[in-house]
Amino acid sequence: MRISTPFAAAALGLLALAGASHAQDAAAPVRGYSLPLVDLAADTARQVIVDREPGQYLGHPTTVLLEDGRTIVAVYPKGHGRGPIVMKRSTDGGRTWSERLPTPPNWETSLEVPTIYRVADAKGTKRLIMFSGLYPVRLAVSEDDGASWSGLAPIGNFGGIVAMASLVPLRTGAGHYMALFHDDGRFIAERAAEGPRRFTVYKTISTDGGLSWGPPEVVVSHPVAHLCEPGAVRSPDGKQIAVLLRENSRKLNAFVIFSNDEGRTWTAPRELPGALTGDRHVAKYAPDGRIFVTFRDMALESATKGDWVAWVGTYDDIVNGREGQYRVRLMDNHNPWDCAYPGLELLPDGTFVTTTYGYWEPGAEPYNVSVRLTMAELDRLAAAARRF
């Protein structure tokens, strides 16, 4: 996203670290934010091209880090969500990437963004699983860390959008998982619902290590907000699950809900501060206990609206409606919105590797890039700047 106003030009330098998290009234969140902003968009030394094909839209990657701490598997579509699924592998923590790897023939039929996860069953057998959404949601399985895969097969008589946006290991038993997705009435059943679309977030449960999944259950809907793309993160003590939600009517901020009983029940949705407003939130804990959240910036008042950004703060900031510590612009998107469904991995040395698509060059089709960073690097950059 190209920013040219005087306000934006001032905002997009290395702006401010004020030290403590910035408080807001959670009952009336502002549409913008007052956080410091660290701008990494021009720091090409951090950027690694994962895949690029002239004239071809390459979109929406998700990634998974294997137990060796250096192998990352990425999957993404040739197209905007819909399109043949491409798979690549890095064996050096995202510094270099393989050529495109062989995939089963019916991966060519994918209708939605693929999402990949590590799972294990009650016996300790580890697998990789990959979902592909719309109707019906389908699943592929690898028993050998992604060297070979099954074809896509339906998991049930239901569909959904960005399935599965989050996968949460549950404390209810070994091999138990909760997967979260959304639908607007078009794909949850074989026949689309008639009447106005209503965005609803659903869960589905697996008790056999991700091989089979139960029927969808409603998690949350809202009379005004269009809630979707659930991004889950646990509290530091593991007892609570928070889910950050995109707000697709573009009238309100992003939302959050909480569960204290492993997803059986949920709090009423409430708005987040503008600093966390955006799409397709993906969150991981840094080694020091802070949270790094990467997403597409769609705050209603933001100099980086439409860009690939990140937020740094604490779980308590999310719970208490505080702005957090600072924001980061990861890359400049030359499109009003189309970018940043990111993968996010934390390497053993504390390096975050976050990967996504976007219009990174004017006039070019989107392609996939990884950005590497550490919290210590971000803290130094933020501390050297002034508050915005």
Label each region the model flagged:
Residues A20-H22:
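Sec/Tat signal peptide C-region and signal peptidase I cleavage site
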